[in-house]
Amino acid sequence: RVLVGKDEALLWALAAILARGHILLEDIPGVGKTTMALSFARALDLEYGRIQFTPDVLPSDITGYSVPDPQGGLSYRPGGILCNLFLADELNRATSRTQSALLEAMEEGQVTVDGISHPLPQPFVVIATQNPTGAAGTQLLPDSQVDRFTLRLTLGYPAPKDEAAMVKNRQAGNP
């Protein structure tokens, strides 16, 4: 067990994933948000992609981009979102323009680059993390984006006994 003492949050998250809904994890750094996403990808055998959202991340980093090919046409280079479970880590640190690159993917299951739509693998789930609004370098997510999430969770700090169990699991070689 990777996240000890978070059974209710894990059950809610699993239900959202099985329903092909998207999850917004809002919490302080270091409580297991990223670990939770990676654990679900491994446990459910889903192709995992992750982008650490910072102010310099571009929409094309997410959706992909076109490059000239030797035949004189354009060739598509997939972005980080072309996977089954995409972790948008610290989403509220990115610019609004970059955040909006997720909207089509979350709503329609595709991305459009240079007028050409590219379907996302199925199932497709976004787990986005965000630090609490007001933390340095963060901005409020727009309602149009928050509306795309099926579930919004917080994890909180583990209880001392749960933290000790996690340390013991790590020492035993479990993730």
Question: Where do the protein language model's features map onto the residues?
Answer:
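Dynamic helix-loop-helix/coil hinge segments at AAA+ ATPase domain boundaries and subdomain interfaces
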Residues: R1-A9
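Short loop/turn elements that form and flank the Walker-type P-loop nucleotide-binding site
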Residues: L11, L18-R20, V31, L44, ...
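Conserved beta-strand position immediately N-terminal to the Walker
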Residues: I23, F86, F124
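Walker B catalytic acidic pair
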Residues: D27, D89-E90, A101
